Amino acid sequence: MTHVSRRKFLFTTGAAAAASILVHGCTSNGSQSATTGEQAPSAAPAANVSAANAPKVETTKAKLGFIPLTDAAPLIIAKEKGFFAKYGMTDIEVIKQKSWPVTRDNLKIGSSGGGIDGAHILSPMPYLMTINDKVPMYILARLNTNGQAISVAEKFKELNVNLESKSLKDAAIKAKADKKALKMGITFPGGTHDLWMRYWLAAGGINPDQDVVLEAVPPPQMVANMKVNTVDGFCVGEPWNAQLVNQKIGYSALVTGELWKDHPEKAFSMRQDWIEQNPNAAQAILMAILEAQQWCDKAENKEEMCKICSDRKYFNVAAADIIERAKGNIDYGDGRKEQNFAHRMKFWADNASYPYKSHDIWFLTEDIRWGYLPKDTKVQDIVNQVNKEDLWKKAAKAIGVADAEIPASSSRGVETFFDGVKFDPEKPEEYLNSLKIKKV
């Protein structure tokens, strides 16, 4: 079930029409997306709508995609609070996408073909697009760290399935023997949620390619699929894990920051050709997003952020499903609770926005591990091509970020995972060779 072509997209029975669009029409253009050009009633624009440091832009227009996930907030806030307009990008469209494959396909055709120019995106996707789809992409920023979860059905409470997946191993083996293999939802093959799920399962001795079935499911459909027992568990971003708990359908075994503290998650990425044609506009967009990330990370703005994002044209969920985990208050749904948790989603704090190349090296190494990329992939070369940390630094300085607050290194150093495994970005081959369960 590793290859993209063999993945299925799961929906509830009532979403059959949407399933047909996604499975049979993935090359469709922006007509599948709901444009969110209008202003939310609660959002006042930024006071300064003509910043002195705004670059002289080549165009005021760009189409940016997002999936309804809390970590898309910087794009939504940049639109609704007037940060895009502040830096001269007065005609930005922030456009809802139905799934990550739709995001990919709309990026492939670009806005000139009815698609989009950039997006809130799973961090590995720009690499998969650049390598596999031959659509050169640039990563301009990391949108957040942490903020995802692996949630499972209520039936697993008695097994005490949590940070350690080994308690699930016997159930997985039995289900496979009964020809009813456990199905675990992920959002995109080779994307972050897929990699978190695979790492967690493998750490507990469960082979994700042999012992369970991984199914690609659009994030907003995760809870519905759990409700009708189409999936037994899933890995997705918020607010869908919180919604699952609030509806008492399942519980969160873990939040992903427990797997890897302050792990990188979503990125802001744009087509390389668009950036090369509009370098000043790209800088203006990036400046606006960085400022929005700073705004989103302030405690006093969380309520407003969640209210804006909950709107029908964005997430179309109750603000109550977003706010608590956005604040770092985690109700796992099985009696465990955390307040102001250290593993909360971060947009700016602790260099959350900086696109460390060392993190992208890990993503590519994991995609090699699971067969999404060939073993001979020139990892460092492709990271240097796609990751534009230099543009991040330029934009950060332009909005007044002090030099002391800008990372001096492309690497965050050696990373340690929950199971004690270490990843040295200087020695990715050693890490890969040390892993017991893998496809290569």
Curated annotation (Swiss-Prot):
Membrane topology, record value: Lipid-anchor
Task: List each coiled-coil range.
Answer: none
Q: Where does nitrate bind?
A: W100, Q148, H193, G237, K266
Bias type Polar residues, positions: 30-39
Arranged from A to Z, the UniProt key words for this protein are:
Cell inner membrane, Cell membrane, Ion transport, Lipoprotein, Membrane, Nitrate assimilation, Palmitate, Signal, Transport
Span of the signal peptide: 1-25
Q: Lipid link (N-palmitoyl cysteine) located at?
A: C26
**Which residue intervals are annotated with compositional bias (Low complexity) in the record?**
40-51
Q: What is its main location?
A: membrane
* S-diacylglycerol cysteine lipid sites: C26
Chain intervals for the UniProt region annotation (Disordered) = 30-51
Cell location: Cell inner membrane
One Gene Ontology biological process: nitrate assimilation
Tagged with keyword Ion transport: yes
Q: Which Pfam families match?
A: NMT1_2
GO terms under cellular component:
plasma membrane
Its job: Part of the ABC transporter complex NrtABCD involved in nitrate uptake. The complex is probably also involved in nitrite transport. NrtA is the substrate-binding protein.
- Complexes and interactors: The complex is composed of two ATP-binding proteins (NrtC and NrtD), two transmembrane proteins (NrtB) and a solute-binding protein (NrtA).
- Report what the protein is called: Nitrate/nitrite binding protein NrtA
Q: Tell me the organism.
A: Nostoc sp. (strain PCC 7120 / SAG 25.82 / UTEX 2576)
Lineage of the species this protein comes from:
Bacteria, Bacillati, Cyanobacteriota, Cyanophyceae, Nostocales
